[in-house]
Amino acid sequence: VDYSGLTIPIVNQRTGEISKAQIFVTVLGASGYTYVHASMTQSTKDFINSNINAFYFYGGVPNILVPDNLKAAVISNKKGIVKLNDAYADMARHYGIAIEPARPYKPQDKSKVELGVKAIQRWILMRLRHHTFFNVDQLNEEINKLLDFYNLKKVRRFNKSRTELFELLDKPYLHPLRANRYVYKEFKKATVGIDYHVELLGNG
């Protein structure tokens, strides 16, 4: 689970202002079957939504997710002691997934997705660089078309596509999706006042 360093511009039709869409990438470990999703931020909410969209794309849930140490997933990761973002941990509990963040400065822990990100930059993002997008939905439509092509392309080493390898190697071991999709929650620490009221977002 990772984000691409390359982004795609989104143009506001009314103002002409340009924002940078963030490109989320997941790669399944055995098959290399890849999912790509664009969002406007790398916020916890957008990150979790992209993770869940990946589960629905795959049609199931893996045993383990290996995210990078971005704040949307990991609060701290020092000397083997990991503190996950509360919302991300809550999502993982909902789907019964273990989260094992990559160790800081150990790129081999997520080498599969790093290779996947580079391939996606080359096969998808570079092909979209001369397109103009006015919203992220338009961008995701085009990404999905190219993603199908990418996953169906033969992997020379195996003489099979990532889609074929997925059906053989990963799909049989995915856990079924929960009947109810996870609903994002924000977790906040609050102090109870002497009047027993709790203040949230500045409102008593």
Question: Where in the sequence are the language-model features?
Answer:
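Mobile-element integrase/transposase regions
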Residues: 1-34, 45-46, 183, 187-200
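Short conserved beta-strand segments at catalytic cores or DNA/RNA-binding microdomains
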Residues: 18-32, 39, 66, 91, ...
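Active-site beta-loop-alpha junctions of metal-dependent nucleic acid enzymes
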Residues: 36-60
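Secondary-structure transition/capping motifs at alpha-helix termini
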Residues: 54-63, 94-98
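Acidic/histidine-rich, metal-coordinating catalytic segments
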Residues: 60-80
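RNase H-like two-metal-ion nuclease catalytic core shared by retroviral integrases
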Residues: 67, 79, 99-121, 139
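RNase H-like polynucleotidyl transferase catalytic core
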Residues: 89, 93-110, 129-131
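Active-site-proximal acidic segments at structured loop/helix or strand boundaries
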Residues: 117, 121-204
